[in-house]
Amino acid sequence: MAEFFDALNDDHIAFIAKQPMFFVATAAADGRINLSPKGYDAFRVLGPNRVAYLDLGGSGNETHAHLVADGRITLMFNNFANPALIMRLYGSGKPVLPQDDGWEELAAHFDILPGTRQIFDITIDSIQTSCGWGVPQMDMKAERETLVKYHRQADPEAWVAKSAGRVKSIDGLPTRATDRYFGGQ
């Protein structure tokens, strides 16, 4: 059965640390809801009501646009092994770019990966745990290295050109992204 909490406790933090992936959901007042899976060693608990995750450049930038427009975010962790458990973190967040105040403080918590474009700084309002009994059991095989390898080998100028269309969401919402933000001068 579902339980709600006002802050992360030690058991929650230990559960999060064991999960190899998590899911991020955001939406603006109008338009599409975005739901994205995330991997890598990219999530950090910064306090009982504060978390952050490192974001790499990819196919879109929906989370950024939605957080600028609305601020709401839900993160979900799921144990695909035993014991079954689902944990949702409800809150608000903001994108922090390399040129922003606060970048250095947040970046110090991570090994910055090639292609890092921002860190999402999230304040948690509530936490919900539920049984997860309807979720299948699966084993972790390995992290996919494709995205990091791509960014290691990418030509910065080509990346800037390719990323120019990612300064808006698929619904046309603006982000704070710039050519400099994507690695240009």
Show the residue positions of the predicted features:
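Binding-site signature for planar aromatic cofactors or substrates
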Residues: M1-Q185
